[in-house]
Amino acid sequence: LLVAMDGANDYALNWLRAAVDAVAGRELTAGHPLPLPELKQFLRMTEHNPRARRLAFELVARTDPATADQLLAGMLNDPSLELRRDAVQKLVDQADQAIARTNPVVAAPLLQSALRSARDVTQIEGIADKLKGLGQPVDLQKHFGFLSEWKVIGPFDNTGKKGFAIAYP
């Protein structure tokens, strides 16, 4: 059912997710274990639908939270933004624990690593605030790749909405 989610539209994805949830719930209620090796293998295949992989991760986390936590360590550069966000959050949580123990030497590299892997704007801003609190300000403009300086090398005539269509000699 998880593989069937590859290439499915949103409507079909919702139906397939409900089917997977029903099957998993029935198996767990009957006392049967979920096939963790197959779920982990599916989760590692990044070519599958990100929502299907997220569902596989949730099933692993439901039955074996320790394994799910171990899997997150390898997902800092995952193409699935939801899984990547969880992996980054794990690093941020570790950094928060280090800060609580007044150990900024450990926290700063964790936050730097989290910042390099983060893609969620609110998460990036939160990490930047924590780094600023540790005396390591982050240039968010540079981090996001915004152009802040440029040079105009010639005129640009846009009278009458000519724009780019005009050819200059």
Describe each model-derived feature in a short phrase.
Residues V3, Y11-A30, Q41-R44, R51-P65, ...:
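Structural detector for internal amphipathic alpha-helices that build alpha-solenoid repeat scaffolds
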Residues G7:
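N-terminal small/polar loop signature for handling phosphorylated ligands or for N-terminal nucleophile
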Residues D10, P50, A165-P169:
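Charged/polar interaction segments and conserved charged motifs
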